[in-house]
Amino acid sequence: MKVYLIYVLAAVAEIAGCFSFWAWLKLGKTGWILLPGMVALAAFAWLLTLVATEAAGRAYAAYGGIYIAASLFWLWGVEGHAPDRWDIAGGVVCLAGTAIILFGPRG
């Protein structure tokens, strides 16, 4: 369960950090919004190093599904746009892929 918590925290940090650039460049927010955004992006990178795996690529691949699901929650909770059925179906498929990567037998 610890790995899921790390991935969820990493996703929130990455999305918040990237959104700071979106807010600055597309929504006309002040450039100062980039400071907490860059801290969030650094936290995201650090959090992924806490995943117990021998290969960075595997950690990143498994994280991808969590990121997608978290992005859909961000879409709904922060931006006020409800995900449609295709968003939800895609998120479920990605989470299934994450589970396969995390829990599949290793040879």
From Swiss-Prot:
Protein name: UPF0060 membrane protein Atu1058
Family: Belongs to the UPF0060 family.
Broad class of the protein's primary localization: membrane
Membrane topology listed for this record: Multi-pass membrane protein
Keyword tags: Cell inner membrane, Cell membrane, Membrane, Transmembrane, Transmembrane helix
Top-level taxon in the UniProt lineage: Bacteria
GO CC annotation terms, alphabetical: plasma membrane
Protein species of origin: Agrobacterium fabrum (strain C58 / ATCC 33970)
TM spans (from-to): 5-25, 32-52, 59-79, 85-105
Subcellular location: Cell inner membrane
